[in-house]
From Swiss-Prot:
It comes from Flavobacterium johnsoniae (strain ATCC 17061 / DSM 2064 / JCM 8514 / BCRC 14874 / CCUG 350202 / NBRC 14942 / NCIMB 11054 / UW101). HAMAP family: DnaK. Residues 596-615 have a biased composition (Low complexity). The modification Phosphothreonine is found at T197. Residues 617-627 have a biased composition (Acidic residues). This is Chaperone protein DnaK. PANTHER family: HEAT SHOCK PROTEIN 70KDA. Acts as a chaperone. The keyword Phosphoprotein applies. Induction: By stress conditions e.g. heat shock. GO terms for molecular function: ATP binding; ATP-dependent protein folding chaperone; unfolded protein binding. Disulfide bonds: none annotated.
Length: 627
Protein backbone atom coordinates (compact mmCIF):
# COMPACT_ATOMS: atom_id res chain seq x y z
CA UNK A 1 0.00 0.00 0.00
CA UNK A 2 1.32 3.46 -0.95
CA UNK A 3 1.33 6.49 1.32
CA UNK A 4 -2.04 7.96 2.30
CA UNK A 5 -1.62 11.73 2.43
CA UNK A 6 -3.64 14.09 4.62
CA UNK A 7 -5.09 17.21 3.00
CA UNK A 8 -6.68 20.19 4.74
CA UNK A 9 -8.76 21.66 1.90
CA UNK A 10 -9.35 25.13 3.29
CA UNK A 11 -11.40 28.12 2.18
CA UNK A 12 -8.38 30.43 2.22
CA UNK A 13 -5.38 28.09 2.41
CA UNK A 14 -4.74 24.38 1.97
CA UNK A 15 -2.06 22.17 3.50
CA UNK A 16 -0.76 18.64 2.88
CA UNK A 17 0.94 16.28 5.31
CA UNK A 18 2.17 12.67 5.38
CA UNK A 19 3.36 10.19 8.00
CA UNK A 20 7.15 9.71 8.03
CA UNK A 21 7.92 7.01 10.57
CA UNK A 22 6.03 7.94 13.74
CA UNK A 23 5.65 11.61 12.86
CA UNK A 24 3.37 13.59 10.54
CA UNK A 25 5.35 15.94 8.31
CA UNK A 26 3.91 19.06 6.66
CA UNK A 27 5.13 19.18 3.05
CA UNK A 28 6.27 22.54 1.58
CA UNK A 29 4.97 23.36 -1.90
CA UNK A 30 7.02 24.24 -5.00
CA UNK A 31 7.21 27.85 -3.77
CA UNK A 32 8.73 26.67 -0.47
CA UNK A 33 5.66 27.48 1.65
CA UNK A 34 3.95 25.10 4.06
CA UNK A 35 0.45 26.30 3.16
CA UNK A 36 -0.95 27.00 -0.30
CA UNK A 37 -3.61 29.66 -1.06
CA UNK A 38 -6.81 27.94 -2.26
CA UNK A 39 -6.86 30.22 -5.30
CA UNK A 40 -7.14 29.32 -8.99
CA UNK A 41 -6.45 31.72 -11.87
CA UNK A 42 -7.19 31.37 -15.57
CA UNK A 43 -4.64 33.39 -17.52
CA UNK A 44 -4.07 34.22 -21.18
CA UNK A 45 -3.03 31.30 -23.35
CA UNK A 46 -5.22 28.85 -21.43
CA UNK A 47 -2.78 28.32 -18.56
CA UNK A 48 -4.23 27.64 -15.10
CA UNK A 49 -2.28 28.87 -12.05
CA UNK A 50 -2.90 27.53 -8.55
CA UNK A 51 -1.77 28.86 -5.17
CA UNK A 52 0.70 31.72 -4.75
CA UNK A 53 1.18 32.31 -8.52
CA UNK A 54 -2.61 32.73 -8.80
CA UNK A 55 -2.79 35.05 -5.78
CA UNK A 56 0.00 37.30 -7.10
CA UNK A 57 -1.90 38.19 -10.28
CA UNK A 58 -5.37 38.56 -8.70
CA UNK A 59 -5.53 42.39 -8.82
CA UNK A 60 -4.92 42.55 -12.58
CA UNK A 61 -7.17 39.54 -13.34
CA UNK A 62 -10.00 39.70 -10.77
CA UNK A 63 -12.83 38.17 -12.83
CA UNK A 64 -10.80 35.05 -13.64
CA UNK A 65 -9.19 34.53 -10.23
CA UNK A 66 -11.24 32.18 -8.05
CA UNK A 67 -10.94 32.32 -4.26
CA UNK A 68 -13.17 31.02 -1.42
CA UNK A 69 -14.81 28.44 -3.72
CA UNK A 70 -15.31 26.16 -0.70
CA UNK A 71 -18.22 28.38 0.32
CA UNK A 72 -20.10 27.21 -2.79
CA UNK A 73 -19.47 23.48 -2.28
CA UNK A 74 -22.59 21.32 -2.06
CA UNK A 75 -24.99 24.26 -2.30
CA UNK A 76 -27.75 25.10 -4.74
CA UNK A 77 -27.53 28.28 -6.81
CA UNK A 78 -30.32 29.85 -4.73
CA UNK A 79 -28.40 29.18 -1.50
CA UNK A 80 -25.30 31.04 -2.72
CA UNK A 81 -26.79 34.39 -3.78
CA UNK A 82 -25.23 36.35 -0.92
CA UNK A 83 -21.82 34.73 -1.48
CA UNK A 84 -21.97 35.42 -5.23
CA UNK A 85 -22.44 39.17 -4.62
CA UNK A 86 -19.22 39.31 -2.59
CA UNK A 87 -16.83 37.84 -5.18
CA UNK A 88 -15.42 39.56 -8.29
CA UNK A 89 -15.88 36.50 -10.53
CA UNK A 90 -19.15 35.58 -12.24
CA UNK A 91 -21.33 32.93 -10.57
CA UNK A 92 -24.24 31.68 -12.71
CA UNK A 93 -26.92 29.00 -12.50
CA UNK A 94 -25.87 25.67 -14.01
CA UNK A 95 -27.32 22.19 -14.42
CA UNK A 96 -29.12 20.66 -11.41
CA UNK A 97 -29.55 24.17 -9.96
CA UNK A 98 -25.83 24.29 -9.12
CA UNK A 99 -23.73 27.47 -8.86
CA UNK A 100 -21.11 27.54 -11.62
CA UNK A 101 -18.22 29.93 -12.23
CA UNK A 102 -18.30 31.39 -15.74
CA UNK A 103 -14.84 31.67 -17.32
CA UNK A 104 -15.13 32.80 -20.95
CA UNK A 105 -18.34 30.81 -21.42
CA UNK A 106 -17.00 27.60 -19.82
CA UNK A 107 -18.93 26.83 -16.63
CA UNK A 108 -16.93 25.30 -13.78
CA UNK A 109 -18.44 23.61 -10.71
CA UNK A 110 -17.08 24.21 -7.21
CA UNK A 111 -15.91 20.57 -7.23
CA UNK A 112 -13.83 21.07 -10.41
CA UNK A 113 -12.17 24.20 -9.04
CA UNK A 114 -11.47 22.60 -5.65
CA UNK A 115 -9.99 19.62 -7.53
CA UNK A 116 -7.38 21.97 -9.01
CA UNK A 117 -6.21 22.88 -5.50
CA UNK A 118 -6.24 19.18 -4.55
CA UNK A 119 -4.15 18.38 -7.65
CA UNK A 120 -1.59 20.94 -6.47
CA UNK A 121 -1.52 19.24 -3.03
CA UNK A 122 -1.19 15.82 -4.69
CA UNK A 123 1.72 17.03 -6.86
CA UNK A 124 3.39 18.65 -3.82
CA UNK A 125 3.28 15.30 -1.99
CA UNK A 126 4.47 13.35 -5.05
CA UNK A 127 7.47 15.66 -5.54
CA UNK A 128 8.40 15.21 -1.87
CA UNK A 129 7.89 11.44 -1.72
CA UNK A 130 9.25 10.67 -5.18
CA UNK A 131 6.32 8.37 -5.91
CA UNK A 132 2.78 8.53 -7.27
CA UNK A 133 0.09 9.31 -4.69
CA UNK A 134 -3.43 7.98 -5.25
CA UNK A 135 -4.99 7.91 -1.76
CA UNK A 136 -5.88 10.70 0.64
CA UNK A 137 -7.75 11.66 3.78
CA UNK A 138 -9.45 15.02 3.20
CA UNK A 139 -10.82 17.23 5.95
CA UNK A 140 -14.14 19.09 6.00
CA UNK A 141 -15.78 21.43 8.52
CA UNK A 142 -17.57 19.36 11.17
CA UNK A 143 -20.84 21.13 10.39
CA UNK A 144 -20.76 20.27 6.66
CA UNK A 145 -23.95 18.52 5.61
CA UNK A 146 -24.15 15.43 3.40
CA UNK A 147 -24.22 17.40 0.14
CA UNK A 148 -21.08 19.31 1.10
CA UNK A 149 -19.29 16.09 2.10
CA UNK A 150 -20.30 14.43 -1.17
CA UNK A 151 -19.02 17.47 -3.10
CA UNK A 152 -15.65 17.26 -1.29
CA UNK A 153 -15.38 13.54 -2.12
CA UNK A 154 -16.23 14.32 -5.77
CA UNK A 155 -13.50 16.99 -5.86
CA UNK A 156 -11.01 14.38 -4.66
CA UNK A 157 -12.10 11.93 -7.35
CA UNK A 158 -11.80 14.60 -10.06
CA UNK A 159 -8.26 15.31 -8.83
CA UNK A 160 -7.37 11.64 -9.30
CA UNK A 161 -7.46 10.73 -5.62
CA UNK A 162 -9.21 7.84 -3.91
CA UNK A 163 -10.68 9.50 -0.83
CA UNK A 164 -10.07 6.95 1.92
CA UNK A 165 -11.84 9.01 4.55
CA UNK A 166 -13.58 12.35 5.01
CA UNK A 167 -12.63 13.58 8.49
CA UNK A 168 -13.95 16.58 10.43
CA UNK A 169 -11.45 19.42 10.86
CA UNK A 170 -11.76 19.81 14.67
CA UNK A 171 -11.46 16.03 15.07
CA UNK A 172 -8.30 16.04 12.95
CA UNK A 173 -6.90 18.86 15.11
CA UNK A 174 -7.67 16.88 18.27
CA UNK A 175 -5.93 13.83 16.78
CA UNK A 176 -2.79 15.89 16.11
CA UNK A 177 -2.94 17.46 19.58
CA UNK A 178 -3.64 14.29 21.53
CA UNK A 179 -1.58 11.58 19.78
CA UNK A 180 1.27 11.90 22.30
CA UNK A 181 -1.10 12.22 25.28
CA UNK A 182 -2.56 8.70 25.22
CA UNK A 183 -2.10 8.10 28.93
CA UNK A 184 -4.13 11.08 30.13
CA UNK A 185 -7.93 11.12 30.16
CA UNK A 186 -9.09 14.62 29.34
CA UNK A 187 -11.94 16.54 27.80
CA UNK A 188 -11.03 19.14 25.20
CA UNK A 189 -12.87 21.79 23.21
CA UNK A 190 -11.64 22.58 19.70
CA UNK A 191 -12.62 26.06 18.49
CA UNK A 192 -11.95 26.10 14.72
CA UNK A 193 -12.40 29.41 12.89
CA UNK A 194 -11.08 29.15 9.34
CA UNK A 195 -11.35 31.31 6.26
CA UNK A 196 -14.97 30.48 5.49
CA UNK A 197 -16.37 28.16 8.14
CA UNK A 198 -16.61 27.82 11.91
CA UNK A 199 -16.78 24.64 14.02
CA UNK A 200 -16.71 23.76 17.67
CA UNK A 201 -16.22 20.17 18.81
CA UNK A 202 -16.07 18.74 22.31
CA UNK A 203 -14.04 15.53 22.63
CA UNK A 204 -12.95 13.05 25.26
CA UNK A 205 -9.41 11.68 24.93
CA UNK A 206 -8.01 8.65 26.72
CA UNK A 207 -5.96 5.51 26.00
CA UNK A 208 -5.75 6.24 22.30
CA UNK A 209 -9.53 6.72 21.96
CA UNK A 210 -10.68 10.05 20.51
CA UNK A 211 -14.42 10.29 21.08
CA UNK A 212 -16.38 13.29 19.82
CA UNK A 213 -19.10 14.10 22.34
CA UNK A 214 -20.74 16.91 20.37
CA UNK A 215 -20.19 19.28 17.50
CA UNK A 216 -21.75 22.50 16.26
CA UNK A 217 -20.88 25.34 13.95
CA UNK A 218 -21.71 27.78 11.18
CA UNK A 219 -20.65 27.02 7.60
CA UNK A 220 -21.06 30.69 6.66
CA UNK A 221 -18.76 32.25 9.23
CA UNK A 222 -15.02 32.69 8.81
CA UNK A 223 -12.11 34.99 8.11
CA UNK A 224 -13.73 36.10 4.85
CA UNK A 225 -16.56 37.66 6.88
CA UNK A 226 -14.09 39.58 9.05
CA UNK A 227 -12.42 40.83 5.85
CA UNK A 228 -15.85 41.81 4.53
CA UNK A 229 -16.60 44.18 7.44
CA UNK A 230 -13.36 46.04 6.64
CA UNK A 231 -14.20 46.06 2.91
CA UNK A 232 -17.66 47.48 3.61
CA UNK A 233 -16.27 50.09 6.02
CA UNK A 234 -13.65 51.24 3.49
CA UNK A 235 -16.14 51.25 0.61
CA UNK A 236 -18.77 53.15 2.61
CA UNK A 237 -16.23 55.75 3.78
CA UNK A 238 -14.94 56.24 0.23
CA UNK A 239 -18.49 56.48 -1.14
CA UNK A 240 -19.33 59.17 1.42
CA UNK A 241 -16.25 61.19 0.46
CA UNK A 242 -16.13 60.62 -3.31
CA UNK A 243 -19.61 59.38 -4.28
CA UNK A 244 -18.16 56.20 -5.84
CA UNK A 245 -18.92 52.62 -4.71
CA UNK A 246 -15.66 50.69 -5.20
CA UNK A 247 -17.50 47.37 -4.76
CA UNK A 248 -19.05 47.76 -8.22
CA UNK A 249 -15.70 47.56 -10.03
CA UNK A 250 -14.07 44.06 -9.97
CA UNK A 251 -10.50 45.40 -9.95
CA UNK A 252 -11.19 47.92 -7.16
CA UNK A 253 -13.04 45.24 -5.19
CA UNK A 254 -10.07 42.88 -5.50
CA UNK A 255 -7.73 45.60 -4.22
CA UNK A 256 -10.09 46.23 -1.30
CA UNK A 257 -10.11 42.49 -0.52
CA UNK A 258 -6.32 42.27 -0.43
CA UNK A 259 -6.03 45.46 1.65
CA UNK A 260 -8.69 44.25 4.11
CA UNK A 261 -6.98 40.89 4.64
CA UNK A 262 -3.60 42.60 5.13
CA UNK A 263 -5.10 45.09 7.62
CA UNK A 264 -6.81 42.29 9.57
CA UNK A 265 -3.52 40.39 9.87
CA UNK A 266 -1.57 43.51 10.90
CA UNK A 267 -4.13 44.36 13.59
CA UNK A 268 -3.41 41.01 15.28
CA UNK A 269 -0.05 42.42 16.37
CA UNK A 270 -0.51 46.21 16.03
CA UNK A 271 -2.90 48.68 17.64
CA UNK A 272 -3.40 50.54 14.35
CA UNK A 273 -2.74 50.08 10.63
CA UNK A 274 -2.80 52.37 7.60
CA UNK A 275 -4.62 51.25 4.46
CA UNK A 276 -3.13 53.01 1.45
CA UNK A 277 -4.52 52.32 -2.03
CA UNK A 278 -3.21 54.85 -4.58
CA UNK A 279 -5.07 55.13 -7.90
CA UNK A 280 -7.88 52.94 -6.58
CA UNK A 281 -10.20 54.46 -9.21
CA UNK A 282 -10.49 57.50 -11.48
CA UNK A 283 -13.08 60.08 -12.52
CA UNK A 284 -13.15 62.85 -15.12
CA UNK A 285 -11.33 65.06 -12.61
CA UNK A 286 -8.44 62.59 -12.30
CA UNK A 287 -7.24 59.61 -10.24
CA UNK A 288 -8.60 58.91 -6.76
CA UNK A 289 -6.62 57.51 -3.84
CA UNK A 290 -7.81 55.76 -0.69
CA UNK A 291 -5.89 56.37 2.53
CA UNK A 292 -7.45 55.33 5.85
CA UNK A 293 -6.26 54.45 9.32
CA UNK A 294 -7.98 51.57 11.09
CA UNK A 295 -7.46 50.89 14.78
CA UNK A 296 -7.82 47.49 16.41
CA UNK A 297 -10.59 48.93 18.61
CA UNK A 298 -12.55 50.06 15.54
CA UNK A 299 -12.07 46.68 13.83
CA UNK A 300 -13.28 44.88 16.95
CA UNK A 301 -16.32 47.14 17.02
CA UNK A 302 -17.05 46.39 13.33
CA UNK A 303 -16.69 42.62 13.83
CA UNK A 304 -18.39 42.36 17.24
CA UNK A 305 -21.51 40.60 15.91
CA UNK A 306 -19.35 38.00 14.11
CA UNK A 307 -17.44 37.15 17.29
CA UNK A 308 -20.70 36.81 19.23
CA UNK A 309 -22.14 34.65 16.44
CA UNK A 310 -19.29 32.19 16.93
CA UNK A 311 -19.96 31.85 20.66
CA UNK A 312 -23.58 30.69 20.26
CA UNK A 313 -22.60 27.28 18.77
CA UNK A 314 -19.93 26.94 21.51
CA UNK A 315 -22.57 27.14 24.25
CA UNK A 316 -24.82 24.73 22.31
CA UNK A 317 -22.03 22.16 21.81
CA UNK A 318 -21.17 22.22 25.50
CA UNK A 319 -24.83 21.74 26.42
CA UNK A 320 -25.22 18.85 23.94
CA UNK A 321 -22.16 17.16 25.46
CA UNK A 322 -23.75 17.47 28.91
CA UNK A 323 -20.75 19.37 30.23
CA UNK A 324 -20.01 22.70 31.89
CA UNK A 325 -17.01 24.94 31.19
CA UNK A 326 -15.28 23.64 34.34
CA UNK A 327 -15.31 20.10 32.87
CA UNK A 328 -13.10 21.17 29.94
CA UNK A 329 -9.40 20.47 30.54
CA UNK A 330 -7.98 22.10 27.40
CA UNK A 331 -9.19 24.59 24.80
CA UNK A 332 -7.49 24.39 21.41
CA UNK A 333 -7.66 27.20 18.86
CA UNK A 334 -7.52 26.08 15.23
CA UNK A 335 -7.61 28.04 11.97
CA UNK A 336 -5.72 31.18 10.96
CA UNK A 337 -8.59 33.45 12.06
CA UNK A 338 -8.03 32.50 15.71
CA UNK A 339 -4.90 34.69 15.63
CA UNK A 340 -7.19 37.71 16.08
CA UNK A 341 -6.70 38.76 19.74
CA UNK A 342 -10.42 39.38 20.28
CA UNK A 343 -11.21 35.76 19.35
CA UNK A 344 -8.74 34.32 21.87
CA UNK A 345 -9.98 36.75 24.54
CA UNK A 346 -13.64 35.83 24.00
CA UNK A 347 -12.97 32.06 24.01
CA UNK A 348 -10.78 32.26 27.13
CA UNK A 349 -13.39 34.41 28.87
CA UNK A 350 -16.14 31.85 28.05
CA UNK A 351 -14.18 28.81 29.26
CA UNK A 352 -12.43 30.60 32.11
CA UNK A 353 -9.02 29.28 31.09
CA UNK A 354 -6.14 30.06 28.75
CA UNK A 355 -6.29 28.48 25.31
CA UNK A 356 -3.53 26.03 24.39
CA UNK A 357 -0.83 27.51 22.17
CA UNK A 358 0.80 24.14 21.53
CA UNK A 359 -0.43 23.64 17.98
CA UNK A 360 0.10 25.56 14.72
CA UNK A 361 -3.44 26.67 13.78
CA UNK A 362 -2.64 26.60 10.04
CA UNK A 363 -1.10 23.11 9.96
CA UNK A 364 -2.68 21.06 12.76
CA UNK A 365 -5.69 19.92 10.69
CA UNK A 366 -3.54 18.55 7.85
CA UNK A 367 -1.31 16.80 10.42
CA UNK A 368 -4.39 15.15 11.94
CA UNK A 369 -5.54 14.04 8.49
CA UNK A 370 -2.12 12.44 7.87
CA UNK A 371 -2.36 10.63 11.22
CA UNK A 372 -5.79 9.29 10.21
CA UNK A 373 -4.18 8.17 6.94
CA UNK A 374 -1.56 6.37 9.03
CA UNK A 375 -4.32 4.69 11.07
CA UNK A 376 -6.02 3.47 7.87
CA UNK A 377 -2.76 2.17 6.37
CA UNK A 378 -1.74 0.45 9.62
CA UNK A 379 1.29 2.69 10.21
CA UNK A 380 -0.28 4.24 13.34
CA UNK A 381 -1.40 1.73 15.98
CA UNK A 382 -3.72 1.86 18.98
CA UNK A 383 -5.74 4.88 17.88
CA UNK A 384 -9.53 4.77 17.65
CA UNK A 385 -11.50 7.73 16.33
CA UNK A 386 -15.21 7.99 17.16
CA UNK A 387 -16.83 10.91 15.35
CA UNK A 388 -20.45 12.08 15.22
CA UNK A 389 -22.99 13.21 12.67
CA UNK A 390 -23.37 17.00 13.04
CA UNK A 391 -27.03 17.29 12.02
CA UNK A 392 -30.18 15.27 12.65
CA UNK A 393 -31.46 13.11 9.79
CA UNK A 394 -35.02 12.22 8.98
CA UNK A 395 -37.82 12.12 6.44
CA UNK A 396 -40.85 14.28 5.73
CA UNK A 397 -44.08 12.79 7.09
CA UNK A 398 -47.73 13.82 6.93
CA UNK A 399 -48.34 17.51 7.55
CA UNK A 400 -44.86 18.50 6.35
CA UNK A 401 -43.25 17.45 9.62
CA UNK A 402 -39.61 16.32 9.88
CA UNK A 403 -39.54 12.94 11.62
CA UNK A 404 -35.99 12.36 12.85
CA UNK A 405 -34.48 8.90 12.61
CA UNK A 406 -30.96 9.82 13.71
CA UNK A 407 -30.36 12.66 16.13
CA UNK A 408 -27.42 15.06 15.81
CA UNK A 409 -24.22 14.08 17.66
CA UNK A 410 -24.88 10.35 17.19
CA UNK A 411 -21.60 8.42 16.94
CA UNK A 412 -20.85 7.19 13.42
CA UNK A 413 -20.90 4.80 11.65
CA UNK A 414 -24.52 4.15 12.62
CA UNK A 415 -27.70 2.55 11.28
CA UNK A 416 -31.32 3.20 12.27
CA UNK A 417 -34.67 1.90 10.96
CA UNK A 418 -38.27 2.98 11.50
CA UNK A 419 -41.58 1.75 10.05
CA UNK A 420 -43.94 4.21 8.33
CA UNK A 421 -47.18 3.75 6.42
CA UNK A 422 -49.25 5.31 3.64
CA UNK A 423 -51.24 8.52 4.05
CA UNK A 424 -54.08 7.62 1.63
CA UNK A 425 -56.16 4.55 0.71
CA UNK A 426 -54.77 2.38 -2.13
CA UNK A 427 -51.63 4.51 -2.35
CA UNK A 428 -49.44 2.79 -5.02
CA UNK A 429 -46.14 4.49 -4.16
CA UNK A 430 -44.45 6.61 -1.52
CA UNK A 431 -41.94 9.40 -1.93
CA UNK A 432 -39.14 9.33 0.59
CA UNK A 433 -38.01 12.93 1.15
CA UNK A 434 -34.71 12.82 3.06
CA UNK A 435 -33.72 15.89 5.10
CA UNK A 436 -30.96 17.08 7.39
CA UNK A 437 -31.41 19.71 10.09
CA UNK A 438 -32.84 20.59 13.48
CA UNK A 439 -36.08 22.44 12.64
CA UNK A 440 -39.51 20.89 13.31
CA UNK A 441 -40.96 21.44 9.82
CA UNK A 442 -39.46 19.74 6.75
CA UNK A 443 -39.52 22.94 4.68
CA UNK A 444 -37.12 24.62 7.12
CA UNK A 445 -34.44 21.94 6.75
CA UNK A 446 -31.94 20.98 4.05
CA UNK A 447 -33.19 18.53 1.41
CA UNK A 448 -30.46 16.03 0.68
CA UNK A 449 -32.40 13.71 -1.63
CA UNK A 450 -35.71 12.20 -2.74
CA UNK A 451 -36.63 8.78 -4.10
CA UNK A 452 -39.75 6.68 -4.73
CA UNK A 453 -40.80 3.21 -3.62
CA UNK A 454 -43.34 1.94 -6.17
CA UNK A 455 -45.54 -1.15 -6.46
CA UNK A 456 -47.31 -0.99 -3.09
CA UNK A 457 -50.43 -3.28 -3.27
CA UNK A 458 -53.82 -1.52 -2.80
CA UNK A 459 -54.66 -1.29 0.90
CA UNK A 460 -56.37 1.10 3.32
CA UNK A 461 -54.22 3.96 4.61
CA UNK A 462 -52.06 3.00 7.56
CA UNK A 463 -51.96 -0.71 6.67
CA UNK A 464 -48.83 -1.03 4.44
CA UNK A 465 -45.60 -1.17 6.42
CA UNK A 466 -42.73 0.78 4.85
CA UNK A 467 -39.43 0.35 6.70
CA UNK A 468 -37.02 3.24 6.14
CA UNK A 469 -33.37 2.68 7.08
CA UNK A 470 -30.62 5.29 7.39
CA UNK A 471 -27.01 4.11 7.21
CA UNK A 472 -24.24 6.66 7.85
CA UNK A 473 -20.67 5.56 7.13
CA UNK A 474 -17.48 6.76 8.82
CA UNK A 475 -17.22 9.61 6.28
CA UNK A 476 -20.59 10.95 7.43
CA UNK A 477 -22.07 10.07 4.01
CA UNK A 478 -25.61 8.73 4.04
CA UNK A 479 -27.27 5.74 2.40
CA UNK A 480 -31.06 5.38 2.68
CA UNK A 481 -33.24 2.38 1.88
CA UNK A 482 -36.99 1.77 1.97
CA UNK A 483 -38.63 -1.68 2.04
CA UNK A 484 -42.29 -2.67 1.73
CA UNK A 485 -42.46 -5.34 4.46
CA UNK A 486 -45.52 -6.90 2.85
CA UNK A 487 -44.03 -7.54 -0.60
CA UNK A 488 -40.34 -7.44 0.28
CA UNK A 489 -39.86 -4.87 -2.48
CA UNK A 490 -37.09 -2.44 -1.66
CA UNK A 491 -35.27 0.55 -3.04
CA UNK A 492 -32.00 1.90 -1.73
CA UNK A 493 -29.80 4.80 -2.78
CA UNK A 494 -26.61 6.43 -1.69
CA UNK A 495 -27.87 9.97 -1.37
CA UNK A 496 -26.83 12.12 -4.31
CA UNK A 497 -27.94 15.62 -3.49
CA UNK A 498 -29.95 17.56 -6.04
CA UNK A 499 -26.97 19.90 -6.25
CA UNK A 500 -24.51 17.04 -6.82
CA UNK A 501 -22.83 15.56 -9.88
CA UNK A 502 -23.61 12.37 -11.76
CA UNK A 503 -20.99 9.64 -12.12
CA UNK A 504 -20.66 10.57 -15.82
CA UNK A 505 -20.02 14.23 -14.95
CA UNK A 506 -17.37 13.27 -12.40
CA UNK A 507 -15.64 11.01 -14.95
CA UNK A 508 -15.68 13.77 -17.57
CA UNK A 509 -14.30 16.32 -15.10
CA UNK A 510 -11.61 13.82 -14.07
CA UNK A 511 -10.52 13.53 -17.71
CA UNK A 512 -10.60 17.33 -18.07
CA UNK A 513 -8.44 17.64 -14.95
CA UNK A 514 -5.95 15.12 -16.38
CA UNK A 515 -5.94 17.10 -19.64
CA UNK A 516 -5.29 20.30 -17.67
CA UNK A 517 -2.39 18.57 -15.92
CA UNK A 518 -1.00 17.61 -19.35
CA UNK A 519 -1.52 21.18 -20.58
CA UNK A 520 0.30 22.52 -17.50
CA UNK A 521 3.17 20.09 -18.11
CA UNK A 522 3.39 21.15 -21.78
CA UNK A 523 3.29 24.84 -20.78
CA UNK A 524 6.10 24.21 -18.28
CA UNK A 525 8.19 22.33 -20.86
CA UNK A 526 7.59 25.16 -23.34
CA UNK A 527 8.76 27.78 -20.82
CA UNK A 528 11.83 25.69 -19.97
CA UNK A 529 12.72 25.27 -23.67
CA UNK A 530 12.36 29.02 -24.28
CA UNK A 531 14.56 29.71 -21.24
CA UNK A 532 17.15 27.22 -22.49
CA UNK A 533 17.22 28.95 -25.89
CA UNK A 534 17.49 32.38 -24.25
CA UNK A 535 20.37 31.20 -22.06
CA UNK A 536 22.17 29.53 -25.01
CA UNK A 537 21.88 32.69 -27.12
CA UNK A 538 23.36 34.80 -24.31
CA UNK A 539 26.20 32.34 -23.60
CA UNK A 540 27.05 31.94 -27.30
CA UNK A 541 27.21 35.71 -27.81
CA UNK A 542 29.52 36.03 -24.76
CA UNK A 543 31.78 33.16 -25.88
CA UNK A 544 32.07 34.56 -29.41
CA UNK A 545 33.36 37.83 -27.94
CA UNK A 546 35.75 36.04 -25.61
CA UNK A 547 37.07 33.31 -27.95
CA UNK A 548 36.46 34.88 -31.36
CA UNK A 549 40.18 35.45 -32.10
CA UNK A 550 40.92 31.75 -31.54
CA UNK A 551 38.35 30.61 -34.14
CA UNK A 552 38.82 30.36 -37.89
CA UNK A 553 36.52 32.41 -40.13
CA UNK A 554 34.68 29.24 -41.19
CA UNK A 555 34.12 28.17 -37.58
CA UNK A 556 32.91 31.64 -36.62
CA UNK A 557 30.54 31.80 -39.62
CA UNK A 558 29.06 28.37 -38.79
CA UNK A 559 28.37 29.38 -35.17
CA UNK A 560 26.90 32.77 -36.13
CA UNK A 561 24.64 31.15 -38.76
CA UNK A 562 23.34 28.58 -36.22
CA UNK A 563 22.88 31.39 -33.67
CA UNK A 564 20.80 33.46 -36.13
CA UNK A 565 18.56 30.44 -36.78
CA UNK A 566 18.12 29.92 -33.03
CA UNK A 567 17.21 33.61 -32.50
CA UNK A 568 14.53 33.39 -35.22
CA UNK A 569 13.13 30.16 -33.72
CA UNK A 570 13.06 31.77 -30.26
CA UNK A 571 11.11 34.77 -31.61
CA UNK A 572 8.56 32.50 -33.34
CA UNK A 573 8.39 30.26 -30.21
CA UNK A 574 8.40 27.18 -32.46
CA UNK A 575 9.62 24.46 -30.08
CA UNK A 576 10.75 22.06 -32.82
CA UNK A 577 12.70 24.84 -34.54
CA UNK A 578 14.18 25.87 -31.17
CA UNK A 579 15.39 22.33 -30.51
CA UNK A 580 16.89 22.15 -34.01
CA UNK A 581 18.57 25.54 -33.43
CA UNK A 582 19.99 24.40 -30.08
CA UNK A 583 21.36 21.22 -31.68
CA UNK A 584 22.96 23.22 -34.52
CA UNK A 585 24.57 25.78 -32.18
CA UNK A 586 25.93 22.99 -29.94
CA UNK A 587 27.20 21.05 -32.97
CA UNK A 588 28.95 24.15 -34.40
CA UNK A 589 30.61 24.82 -31.04
CA UNK A 590 31.63 21.18 -30.69
CA UNK A 591 33.37 21.25 -34.09
CA UNK A 592 35.13 24.51 -33.22
CA UNK A 593 36.30 23.43 -29.75
CA UNK A 594 37.54 20.05 -31.01
CA UNK A 595 39.66 21.89 -33.59
CA UNK A 596 40.94 24.28 -30.89
CA UNK A 597 42.00 21.43 -28.61
CA UNK A 598 43.54 19.49 -31.51
CA UNK A 599 45.61 22.56 -32.37
CA UNK A 600 46.60 22.94 -28.71
CA UNK A 601 47.63 19.25 -28.64
CA UNK A 602 50.01 19.69 -31.61
CA UNK A 603 51.74 22.57 -29.83
CA UNK A 604 52.06 20.41 -26.73
CA UNK A 605 53.82 17.62 -28.70
CA UNK A 606 56.32 20.12 -30.17
CA UNK A 607 57.24 21.29 -26.67
CA UNK A 608 57.76 17.76 -25.29
CA UNK A 609 61.40 17.12 -26.45
CA UNK A 610 62.53 20.30 -24.67
CA UNK A 611 60.89 19.06 -21.47
CA UNK A 612 62.68 15.70 -21.82
CA UNK A 613 66.03 17.41 -22.47
CA UNK A 614 65.74 19.63 -19.45
CA UNK A 615 64.82 16.57 -17.42
CA UNK A 616 68.34 14.98 -17.90
CA UNK A 617 69.90 17.31 -15.31
CA UNK A 618 67.40 16.48 -12.57
CA UNK A 619 69.00 14.76 -9.54
CA UNK A 620 67.45 13.11 -6.51
CA UNK A 621 68.45 14.77 -3.22
CA UNK A 622 67.63 14.17 0.40
CA UNK A 623 65.98 16.91 2.41
CA UNK A 624 65.13 17.45 6.03
CA UNK A 625 61.77 18.90 7.03
CA UNK A 626 62.11 21.77 9.50
CA UNK A 627 59.41 21.70 12.11
Amino acid sequence: MGKIIGIDLGTTNSCVSVMEGNEAVVIPNAEGKRTTPSIIAFVEGGEIKVGDPAKRQAVTNPTKTIASIKRFMGHTFAETQDEAKRVPYSVVKGDNNTPRVDIDGRLYTAQELSAMTLQKMKKTAEDYLGQTVTEAVITVPAYFNDAQRQATKEAGEIAGLKVMRIINEPTAAALAYGLDKKGNDQKIAVYDLGGGTFDISVLELGDGVFEVLSTNGDTHLGGDDFDQVIIDWLADEFKTEEGIDLRLDPMSLQRLKEAAEKAKIELSSSAETEINLPYVTATASGPKHLVKKLSRAKFEQLSDTLVKRSMEPVAKALKDAGLSTSDIDEVILVGGSTRMPRIADEVEKFFGKKASKGVNPDEVVAIGAAIQGGVLSGDVKDVLLLDVTPLSLGIETMGGVLTKLIESNTTIPTKKSQVFSTAADSQPSVEIHVLQGERAMAADNKTIGRFHLDGIPPAPRGVPQIEVTFDIDANGIIKVSATDKGTGKSHDIRIEASSGLTAEEIEKMKKDAEANADADRIAKERAEKLNEADSTIFQTESQLKELGDKLTDDQKTAIEYALTELRMAHQSQDLDAIQKGLDNVNAAWKTATEAMYAQGGDQGQQAAPQQEQSGDNVEDVEFEEVK
